[in-house]
Amino acid sequence: MFDLQGRSTLLRYGTSKTQPMTEPTLETILLVEDEPAVRNLFAQALKRAGYSVYEARNGQEAMKLFDQHGESIDMLLTDMRMPYMGGAELAHHLRGRRRNLKLLCISGYPGNLDAELAIDFLAKPFSRDDLLKKVREVLDK
């Protein structure tokens, strides 16, 4: 289980019922998370499930990656609270450039969501299976 409490991060990686895929899905996710250990766990889970993943520490890095690889990115998976540029601001920028970009926001603070973006949300803490299920659900919309 990914368990995050307050500003300090407690991480537990539990067992999963989801088996790794044998072939990549060919879908690409731009993962934006400022906590390195959390970003690494999420990226590993997504890659093991067959997704291609670009990783960014903050919104500014994500914008640069989107400039370089935007055509191949299927989903933005972003933390909402980050330094320099939060997830909502980043989502606004990227949706302004590509209206059909799939969005999934993760946060321990669900009160900060922007209804105008019509984004999907996953509240921390959550399990690996919860993450993979929600990612698949959003990509399939």
Predicted feature locations:
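Conserved acidic carboxylate
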Residues: 33
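Receiver (REC) domain active-site loop signature in two-component systems and cognate sites
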Residues: 82
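Active-site residues of response regulator receiver
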Residues: 79
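C-terminal output helix
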Residues: 43, 126-139
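Acidic, metal-coordinating helix/loop segments flanking the phosphotransfer/catalytic sites
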Residues: 30, 43, 55-75
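Charged docking surfaces used in two-component/phosphorelay signaling
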Residues: 40-48
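Acidic catalytic/metal-coordinating carboxylates
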Residues: 58-61, 85-90
